[in-house]
């Protein structure tokens, strides 16, 4: 799949491989591929104890997902339009 490129953490643009270990906050927005996403939730341990799992959603219902373990970018429309954005630490 095509590389999604950079996204914004706070006021800084970062590449996905530069944000390992970033703690996303619920009710905060992040810009991915020039689109604004809202972080719906933050929970740990869905796939591994070091994963950060964040749901992102657009007002249009479009959801975005990134799987850190496989390094693939996925456009998904998940249950209730919530996707998981997983960033594994230490990879």
What are these regions (language model features)?
Residues 1-9:
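A short "linker-to-beta-strand initiation" element
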Residues 51-71:
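Intrinsically disordered, low-complexity Pro/Gly/Ser/Thr-rich segments with frequent PxxP/GP/PP motifs
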Residues 8-27:
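Surface-exposed ligand/attachment interfaces on beta-rich extracellular proteins
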Residues 40-44, 80-90:
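Edge beta-strands of jelly-roll/beta-sandwich modules across compartments, strongly enriched
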Residues 28-30, 67-82:
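Noncatalytic modules at the cell exterior or secretory-pathway interfaces
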């Amino acid at each position: 799949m095509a590389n999604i490129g950079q996204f914004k953490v706070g006021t800084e643009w970062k590449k996905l491989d530069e944000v390992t270990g970033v703690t996303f906050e619920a009710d905060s927005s992040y810009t991915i591929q020039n689109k604004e996403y809202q972080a719906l939730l933050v929970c740990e341990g869905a796939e591994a104890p070091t994963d950060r799992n964040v749901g992102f959603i657009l007002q249009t219902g479009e959801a975005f997902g990134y799987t850190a373990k496989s390094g693939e970018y996925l456009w998904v429309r998940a249950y209730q339009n919530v996707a998981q954005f997983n960033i594994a630490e230490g990879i």
